[in-house]
Amino acid sequence: MCIRDRDNKGEKQMLLKVVTFNIAHGKGMDGEVNLERQAKLINAYKPDIVFLQEIDMYTKRAENKNQIREFSKKVYLPYCSMESNITFENGYYGDGIISRFPISFSTNYLMPLTDPKHEQRGILCNKIILGTAKINLFSVHLSTYEEERILSTKELMKIIDKIDDDEIIIIGGDFNVGVTRIGKNKYTYEKRSEYEEYNMIEKSLIKLDNTDDTWFSDLGQGCIDTMFYSKNITLKKFETINSNMTSDHYAIYAEFNI
C-alpha cells in the first residue's frame, strides 16, 4: 500500500493491492501440493489483501498443515482469517482472507443448498479499518449448480444491502458462472454474454472487466474468477496472473484508489 495526496487540499488517498486466487489446496496441474510456488507468484505483486479459495486446514492431503497460516507467512502478510464450510479428512476446507492490516471483524455465511448431498458453500466476510475508511472484504466460492449460485448471490446481496453506503466493499473469488456439474468430477462450461449472478451483483457494485479464461483443467475451462468493488473507490488497473500450472486456476490482481 502507498499513500499520496489526493488533491491540493492535502487529502490522502491510498492505493490498495488485491489478489484473488483459487489455490486448489495447493495442488498444481502436475498433482504436487506446493504452497511455496503459488505464494512466489503472488509475492511478485506485493499485495495488501489476498482472497483465497479451496483452502485446507489439518487435512491429510495438506499434510495436516494450517494452509491459511502457511500461505500468510509465505506472502509476508501478518493477518489471516479462514472459515470451514465442510469437514474433510479429519480437517477443514473453506475460504480465506490474508491481510496486511488487522482484521477487526470476521464471519462466515453458509449458503443455501438445493440438495443436502451437494457441497456446502460459504462466503467469508472480513472488515478492516484504515484511518476513516471501513473496508468490507468478501472471499467467495460459489456452487457448481446454477440454481444454488443464484440463491447464494441473493443471500450475498442481502448482506451487502445492510452495509452503510460510506463503507467500502471488495469481493473476490471463484464464482463458477457458466459451470454445470453433470456428475462426479464432470462439468460443462457455457460462455454467455451475461450471467444472472453477475447481473444481480452489478446492480450495486462494479465488476472487473476481465475476460481471459481463469480455470483450466481436464474438467473444463472458462473465465469464472473475478472481483467486484463499490462505487466509492476507483480501479487503477487489473491483471490476470498466469499461475504456471501451480493451480487449475489463474489469479486476478487489481489495484484500487481508496
PLM features: what roles do these ranges have?
Residues 26, 53-60:
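Active-site neighborhood of divalent metal-dependent phosphoester/pyrophosphate hydrolases
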Residues 58-61, 89-91:
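Short active-site-adjacent helix-start/loop capping segments
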Residues 4-49, 79-83, 87-258:
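Active-site regions of metal-assisted phosphoester/phosphodiester hydrolases
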